[in-house]
Amino acid sequence: MAYRKLGRTSSQRKAMLRDLTTDLLINESIVTTEARAKEIRKTVEKMITLGKRGDLHARRQAAAFVRNEIASENYDEATDKYTSTSALQKLFNEIAPRYAERNGGYTRILKTEPRRGDAAPMAIIELV
């Protein structure tokens, strides 16, 4: 089998992977279980590769997977308005150019101590 089931149905698993991938793109580092970290590594690598391509088709493919969440919000005093950046905009405008010269290997998984409640192996996954 080429993927982990993670104890969920396929729709639940896909939703969880979309959420974790979006969170990683926004925060650039998250703490999760080791199995989930290894699984979202695949999707994050694909999204960054799409971001590096940068064409319209790649943008639409990434938009179909990444959640429409606000990555950052800034206040402009001159115009008295808030400007927000979505996770998709951050992927294409900030993250992808950072890895323009890198061929894969955009994430790093660091193992940490087990979770206190159930001793599940935990890991920190972050963008390199």
UniProtKB/Swiss-Prot annotation:
Annotated GO biological process: translation
Q: Which HAMAP family match?
A: Ribosomal_bL17 (MF_01368)
Cite a GO CC annotation. cytosolic large ribosomal subunit
Q: What is this protein called?
A: Large ribosomal subunit protein bL17
UniProt key word Lipoprotein: no
Q: Which family does it belong to?
A: Belongs to the bacterial ribosomal protein bL17 family.
Q: Name one GO molecular function term.
A: structural constituent of ribosome
Query: Species name for this entry?
Result: Streptococcus uberis (strain ATCC BAA-854 / 0140J)
Task: Give one Pfam family, short name only.
Answer: Ribosomal_L17
Q: Quaternary state and partners of this protein? A: Part of the 50S ribosomal subunit. Contacts protein L32.
UniProt entry tagged with the keyword Iron: no
Q: Which PANTHER family match?
A: LARGE RIBOSOMAL SUBUNIT PROTEIN BL17M, RIBOSOMAL PROTEIN L17
The record's keywords, sorted A to Z, are: Ribonucleoprotein, Ribosomal protein
